[in-house]
């Protein structure tokens, strides 16, 4: 949904965002989503993602390359959805630092079940919903290039200057979440000074 989020971004950034978004839900000028109910749900998710980061982030986002925008949207997802952040830290980074360097549906699903054991809200989800969340997360990893079709992990590929942006906004953890090696992170930090 990166294209849809980018399409409504000017509405979200506007001083009159609420009225413009309500109009979009009704008139479907930008999203081209068939049903009003689905548009309403999509707009609610876009608002959640928009609010997960400072407004200045979005101004910079509009000037990024398409590749950098894809990675930026991954960052936003990790900020907006705690469960995705937990999957990244507790499954993906751990697997990246292990011998196997691969992640399967079952690896993430096991983490989902551990989260559900401690979180009544997640525990209340149906098994189908839990599986859908895991599947969506894995799809995101594939779209940003962290996971390939054979479930092997790969670091995010971006120029150092694009990664340095996350340092300037006080989010250095994202470099590790992007599976960069410590020496790469140090090089980016040094170049950002």
Question: At which residue positions do the language-model features occur?
Answer:
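Accessory, usually C-terminal, subdomains that scaffold auxiliary metal cofactors
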Residues: 127-132, 136-193
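Eukaryotic partner-binding/assembly regions in large regulatory complexes
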Residues: 1-72
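Short, positively charged loop/turn segments that connect secondary-structure elements
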Residues: 33-36, 113-133
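Leucine-rich, amphipathic alpha-helical/linker segments
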Residues: 2-16, 77-78, 82, 172-193
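Positively charged, polyanion-binding regions of nucleic-acid-associated proteins
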Residues: 71-101
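A short secondary-structure junction motif
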Residues: 91, 115-119, 144
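Short acidic, hydrophobic short linear motifs in intrinsically disordered regions
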Residues: 21-22, 99-124
């Amino acid at each position: 949904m990166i294209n849809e989020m980018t399409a409504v971004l000017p509405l979200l950034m506007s001083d009159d965002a609420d009225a413009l978004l309500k109009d979009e839900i009704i008139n479907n000028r930008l999203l081209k989503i068939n049903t009003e109910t689905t548009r309403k749900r999509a707009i609610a998710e876009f608002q959640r993602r928009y609010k997960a980061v400072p407004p200045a982030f979005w101004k910079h986002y509009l000037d990024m390359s398409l590749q950098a925008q894809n990675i930026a949207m991954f960052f936003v997802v990790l900020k907006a959805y705690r469960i995705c952040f937990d999957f990244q830290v507790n499954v993906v980074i751990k697997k990246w630092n292990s011998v196997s360097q691969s992640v399967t549906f079952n690896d993430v699903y096991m983490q989902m079940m551990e989260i559900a054991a401690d979180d009544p809200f997640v525990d209340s989800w149906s098994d189908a919903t839990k599986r859908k969340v895991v599947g969506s997360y894995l799809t995101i990893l594939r779209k940003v290039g962290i996971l390939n079709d054979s479930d092997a992990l790969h670091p995010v590929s971006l120029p150092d200057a694009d990664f340095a942006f996350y340092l300037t906004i006080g989010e250095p953890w994202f470099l590790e979440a992007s599976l960069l090696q410590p020496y790469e992170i140090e090089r980016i930090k040094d170049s950002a000074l």
